[in-house]
A protein has these predicted regions:
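Non-catalytic, conserved peripheral segments adjacent to functional cores
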Residues: 1-105, 124-126, 133-186
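Conserved metal-binding segment of the jelly-roll/cupin
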Residues: 102-124
Length: 186
């Protein structure tokens, strides 16, 4: 595996070794010992998979502590523009984001530790997205940042995405920080 650090501490882009021949390909997407050698002592408890058509926007989701999730994400088929926003209030990179293209073709993976909002926009029809989570889903702790938050200035390369009706109460980053400070969750 080739691991690339990003401009945001703890956020990693991972390229697995892929073995291809006339039958197809094989690669190891997760190995506990390999990740331990990278300094990642992870305990995944839930795997999720979604299927989306082109132009679907999912995110920017997060779970509040103590249910904050780490996620190892990848695309099985199709492609996405994947984005992680640092919402760790004491982080020097608070409010900054990293974006990466994940696809079934490039097989790139993205490690997103707890304390990040995460989302993606699908770039192709029938995109299959997979994520391994370190903490189970907890409805009471879930939250979402507004994908078009003017503070973030994320260029999604799409003006009218297909959005979920599930998250009408998305927050602005500025309000999220105020809430964390008010609740002493910093």
């Amino acid at each position: 595996m080739i691991v690339q650090k990003t401009s945001i501490q703890d956020l990693l882009i991972i390229q697995p070794r892929v073995f291809s021949d006339d039958r197809g390909y094989f690669y190891e997407s997760y190995n506990k010992e390999t990740f331990l050698k990278l300094g990642l002592d992870l305990n995944f408890v839930q795997d999720n998979q979604s299927l989306s058509q082109k132009g679907v926007l999912r995110g920017l989701h997060f779970q509040n502590p103590p249910f904050a999730q780490g996620k190892l994400v990848r695309v099985i088929k199709g492609s996405v523009l994947d984005i992680a926003v640092d919402i760790r209030s004491k982080s020097p990179t608070y409010g900054q984001y990293e974006k990466v293209i994940l696809s079934g073709e490039n097989k790139t993976m993205f490690w997103i530790p707890p304390g990040f909002a995460h989302g993606f926009i699908t770039l192709e029809d029938d995109t299959i997205f997979n994520y391994k989570c370190t903490v189970e889903y907890n409805k009471e702790s879930e939250g979402a940042l507004l994908w078009k938050d003017p503070t973030l200035t994320i260029d999604w390369n799409l003006d009218n995405p297909i959005e979920s009706k599930k998250y009408p109460a998305t927050e602005l980053l500025e309000k999220l920080l105020l809430n964390k400070c008010h609740n002493k969750n910093i």
